[in-house]
Regions:
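Short glycine-rich, Thr/Ser-proximal phosphate-binding strand/loop in the N-terminal lobe
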Residues: 16-60, 232
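Catalytic phosphate/nucleotide-handling subdomain of diverse soluble enzymes
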Residues: 222, 228-263, 269, 333-364
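Adenine-nucleotide phosphate-binding core of ATP-dependent small-molecule kinases
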Residues: 269, 276-280, 287-322
Length: 400
């Protein structure tokens, strides 16, 4: 039989689903795409490696129909990536919140899924959608092994001093209110890739990863283990993000609620969906638009970019303190990989670490590159993240 494995990686949102089929041997993507507007009207985007995107509008009342369409597309005689669905050897699912129950990836059994369900109240937007995707796959591919890869798992090595909030301790005991962190799969992948790229010994290193996308977080990785990260119980803590506020004085919530006559859901909606660089700039949550407005001298766009970069720099400084030093800083995700003027702003605050930016190499987009000068005391680099590949690797390791 075939030695290599084809792994279907699925990331289920509340009304969308992203997928990639990866050959685990060559690590090449055989096909990828997404389903959008599930439960509304439905649209499938499918792209076989080396071919054009195909877009199909079709009703998808639930995730089950969406996944059925993905499977149909994957073994379509014309543009399919496999001849038969039996060539899909395993499925890797992204699960957003594993709480304290999951410190690493696991094979999904009924027992495990019951535990995942217990984490639902910690991530009411994401986890139920992740579970629906898993159940739909089980129905459609009953004999294929499935693995859950948790966004929170990598951060489970944080010490108590880093994860406990200054709140009544009973909230932690009763409800597990504590800091969890997210993007763990990316932070783990990038910290390993960074050590490899720079020829550092991961087990004897201090690495700070800045995952800067529409959601953004920084992590401190000491000897290969996460010791702190900027997101908290939910992804709302920490950096200023695309539409999320990040750290604020909690009393602002009461103040705004009274002034604007909002209930708690209304205030949360503002903090999650209307804040961040979009709220500050009034332009966009997309840094391509922000950069254009910044270059035109739009004062609010300038504020948004300055506030964003300053907050990242402060967190990097905090994590140098947390690890009592740093060997390397890695930028990743959409903004981290592509937006050179933001990287330049962030690095401009780090001169005290003996870091100098190499303006030439900082102009790169989306490739591994060292962007600090050879005489910098700390190496700063860009390392593209690949969460799907990371999920594929985790899946293979457990299913083999």
């Amino acid at each position: 039989g075939r030695i290599q494995m084809n792994v279907l990686v699925i990331n289920c949102g509340s009304s969308s689903l992203k997928y990639q089929l990866i050959n685990s041997d060559s690590e090449e993507v055989l096909a990828k795409g997404l389903c959008e507007r599930i439960g509304i009207d439905g649209r499938l985007v499918y792209q076989k490696e080396g071919m054009d995107k195909e877009i199909t509008e079709a009703p998808m009342p639930t995730h089950k129909e969406a996944i059925q369409m993905v499977l149909d597309a994957l073994h379509n005689p014309k543009s399919g990536a496999v001849k038969d669905l039996s060539e899909i050897d395993a499925v890797g699912h992204r699960v957003v919140h594993g709480g304290e129950k999951f410190a690493k990836s696991v094979v999904l059994t009924e027992e495990v899924l019951a535990k995942v369900e217990e984490c639902n109240e910690l991530a009411p937007l994401h986890n139920p959608a992740n579970l629906i995707g898993i159940r739909a796959c089980q129905d459609l591919m009953p004999n294929v092994p499935m693995v859950g890869v948790f966004d929170t798992a990598f951060h489970q090595t944080m010490p108590r001093k880093a994860f406990l909030y200054g709140l009544p301790y009973e909230y932690y005991e009763k409800y597990k209110v504590r800091r969890y962190g997210f993007h763990g799969t990316s932070h783990s992948f990038v910290s390993k890739a960074c050590a490899e790229y720079l020829k550092l010994d991961l087990k004897n290193s201090k690495i700070i990863v800045a995952h800067l996308g529409n959601g953004a977080s920084v992590s401190a990785v000491l000897n290969g283990e996460c010791v702190d990260t900027s997101m908290g119980l939910t992804p709302l803590e920490g950096l200023v993000m695309g539409t999320r506020s990040g750290d604020i004085d909690p009393a602002i919530m009461e103040f705004i609620a009274k002034k604007e006559n909002l209930d708690i859901d209304g205030v949360m909606n503002v903090l999650n969906k209307k804040s961040g660089v979009e709220g500050l700039s009034g332009v966009s949550s997309d840094f391509r638009d922000l950069e254009a407005a910044y270059n035109e001298g739009n004062p609010r766009a300038i504020d948004a970019c300055e506030v964003f970069a300053y907050r990242v720099a402060k967190y990097i400084g905090a994590y140098v303190a947390a690890m009592n030093g740093v060997d390397a800083i890695a930028f990743t995700a959409g903004i981290g990989e592509n937006t050179s003027f933001i990287r330049e702003k962030i690095v401009s605050y780090l001169g005290y670490l003996g870091i100098k930016l190499d303006k030439k190499t900082n102009d790169v987009r989306g490739v591994e590159e060292i962007i600090s000068t050879p005489d910098s005391k700390v190496t700063v680099c860009v390392i593209p993240t690949n969460e799907e590949l990371a999920i594929c690797r985790e899946t293979v390791a457990l299913v083999k």
